[in-house]
Amino acid sequence: MNLEEEMQVKWEEKKRELEEEVHIALVGQPGAGKSSLINKLIGRKLFETGVHTDTTVDMQEAAYGTLRIHDLPGYGTARFPVERWVEEFHPEQYDLYLFVFEGKLHDSDAILFTFLKQWRDEREHPFFIVRNKKDQIWDEEKPKDALMDEIAKDVRDKLDEPDAAVQFVSCRTSEGIEDLKQAIFAADVLGVKRSKLRAEFQATSMEDLAYKKQHSMKAVNTYAWLGAANAVNPVPGLDVTLDVGMFYKLLSEIRRIFGITDDLAQTLEKYKVLAPIGQRVFSYATQEGVVMMVKKLAGEFAGKEISKYIPFVGQAAAAATGYMMIQKIGEKYVDDCYTIAQEILRGILKR
């Protein structure tokens, strides 16, 4: 295999890693708050709440970054007994499952559990049993802990797993959401998918943000390599080749991962310390802004940075310069977004 072939193999490998998606299936009882739960975990309104999927026969889908969320319709009905439901929607293909319920479990739930265990054991696709609306668990004659123990025992009996974990959460109060997040992050999800889960879920701690920064730095390296290797046209007037569209996509992805949305631009202007950072971040929010920034900084990188590290000439040097530019500017962009996200989490910025 010659150098060109090796580069092509590497390019395809990095592209597959970049494009790999994580598929999450929402299953369980209608009205249990599946939509509210995934909205809470991600921190975005991906699904309308209060829509009961037992009255429909279609799957609802939403995308957020590399996450693909599949809200499956009800099962155990005359039209969709569990086995027929499995044949129709092929849920075995998804990476992980959130089984959400709020009332008593039914025989159809127990049948579904046998499939969930099969997919976990044979395909390494984990599932999580989530009892939503924890704040509404109440009985004047029994303490809440005793009621929760009874619910957990019922789940374990139907699942036939005495040590199975049951996650109790409340989307209204956020109670239990952090524990569920950590359980998902610790799940046996193979390869880069685990990293993407942590990157896309809403950050609720400084530890989450630190992980997002680490993930974003790796993404910068991947995009830098792809952006330089894939570039076929030089930036007009410069001795640099890079894929501007891919560079723009990288910066957009970094903002999304850190939860920095367009509506923050005006808010950031009110804070003296953060205003310059915000201006930098949002000045690169369009492809035109990216091109202007590349033109502004290309001379510095071509003249100083690249000569130290890359002994190339001609087109190879131009591509290598593009790589270094994406790498260095991308890392700085991550730092800026990380700083803003930290302040958001600390509550300094009020939306």
Task: Cite the ranges covered by each PLM segment.
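Conserved G1/Walker A P-loop phosphate-binding module
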Residues: 1-77, 260-261
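Flexible, charged surface loops at secondary-structure boundaries
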Residues: 18-19, 62-64, 89-95, 160
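Switch II of P-loop NTPase G domains
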Residues: 54, 70-118
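Short glycine-/polar-rich loops that comprise or flank the Walker A/P-loop
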Residues: 92-96, 122-127, 161-165
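Canonical P-loop GTPase G-domain recognition
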Residues: 133-199
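Alpha-helical membrane association modules
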Residues: 199-351
